[in-house]
Amino acid sequence: MKLLVVGASYRTAPVAALERLTVAPADLSRVLTRLVAQPYVSEAVLVSTCNRVEVYAVVSGFHGGLGDICAVLAESTGCQPAALADHLYVHFDAAAVNHVFRVAVGLDSMVVGEAQILGQLRDAYHWASEAETVGRLLHELMQQALRVGKRAHSETGIDRAGQSVVTAALGLATELLHSDLACRPALVVGAGAMGSLGVATLARLGAGPVSVTNRGVDRAIRLAESYGATAVPIADLTATLSTVDIVVAATAAPEAVLTRAVVTQALAGRNPSRGPLVLLDLAVPRDVEPGVADLPGVQVIDIDRMAALVADGPVAADAAAVEQIVAAEVDTFLTWLRGADVAPTVAALRGRADDVVAAELGRLVHRRPDLTDEQRADVARTVHRVVQRLLHQPTVRVRQLAAEPGGDQYTALLRELFDLEVPQTSAVGTVPDVVVPDVDPQLGGDAEAPPTGGE
């Protein structure tokens, strides 16, 4: 079996395309089930965040697996296959493992080193386990990815390799407002992971008063109390907009929350001498309706703009250390993978030998009914010892060869020579606990919000 990664991210697709590709939490189980129902796909994990949609799969063939995954993505998102292909990247086997580990440590994130993606990978693994679409190989891959991510954050300073997206975007907001954020009134829409980071960062930068609104009132109240902010009802959104200078929008609403009509009405009651109303849209799908950016007196900073903002940011020397960690861990995993691939084949070979021995002993019993039970047992033990000795050295050697780069050819040859049928691995139903590093809002970690991180 082979590992295949098929996905799109902020690197390959604009936010509008990612919006269409995003799989809602309620649809995850259905899409995962559809994936493993395809002829070439036996295991699947689906990662869907603001900045990436990726399928990690175990497939029986590259082209067949790629076709199956693309077909399911097109079907589940309503995207035309041709349009989908424009934004997808594909990684196979060693490159697939390398990509997943780079994602886990934050090297592939909009903000290098952000830790929030670790929690999102853990959630994706959990959802796949619940849907019974994760088996032996993806179980090991996801567990190892989580360990690698934790190791990178504990052994290096990768957390500080880049600014948080919120901090970077608010830095741009200060330029647009021609002043720092101290005492600038602000509103955070959404009380999920990204909303929490927004409130924390605004508080750290001295903005205020800060208001929080959310469809779930209790969550808004709890978040506001944590940072000395004020919770306001979602019904008061328009009125609150007219009193603030900065808005951080980070809900998981399926449609835009800050529509052109809502913002236009808010602008009518706002003093234009305070400068532009700056809207930071951190959500996918977008919280700010596209037409809002055309309104006079409004500046919209969306994910596309933030990606460009942080693309040339400084990368700490710790990133190089993390690259070394990833390279070493990829080698370790590939060695395990090659061994895992040959183990069922060796077991099948020994099983075939046992079947042959049993059949021949059965024939012996029919030919020599005069043998006593003790004699039959002696013959059986002798034959088994001979077979095991004959198989010992070849199976030890094939395990050694299989652990080397390109070793899968020896496993394939063994199957071909003895016409062995190797069953697929069974699914794993539980996700062992793996501690994910806490996200410090002052150091970043807000690059990728889970699709559930809002209302």
From Swiss-Prot:
It comes from the Bacteria. The active site is at 50 (nucleophile). InterPro entries: 4pyrrol_synth_GluRdtase, 4pyrrol_synth_GluRdtase_dimer, 4pyrrol_synth_GluRdtase_N, GluRdtase_dimer_dom_sf, GluRdtase_N_sf, NAD(P)-bd_dom_sf, Shikm_DH/Glu-tRNA_Rdtase. CDD domains: NAD_bind_Glutamyl_tRNA_reduct. GO terms for biological process: protoporphyrinogen IX biosynthetic process from glutamate. Belongs to the glutamyl-tRNA reductase family. During catalysis, the active site Cys acts as a nucleophile attacking the alpha-carbonyl group of tRNA-bound glutamate with the formation of a thioester intermediate between enzyme and glutamate, and the concomitant release of tRNA(Glu). The thioester intermediate is finally reduced by direct hydride transfer from NADPH, to form the product GSA. Possesses an unusual extended V-shaped dimeric structure with each monomer consisting of three distinct domains arranged along a curved 'spinal' alpha-helix. The N-terminal catalytic domain specifically recognizes the glutamate moiety of the substrate. The second domain is the NADPH-binding domain, and the third C-terminal domain is responsible for dimerization. This is Glutamyl-tRNA reductase. It comes from Salinispora tropica (strain ATCC BAA-916 / DSM 44818 / JCM 13857 / NBRC 105044 / CNB-440).
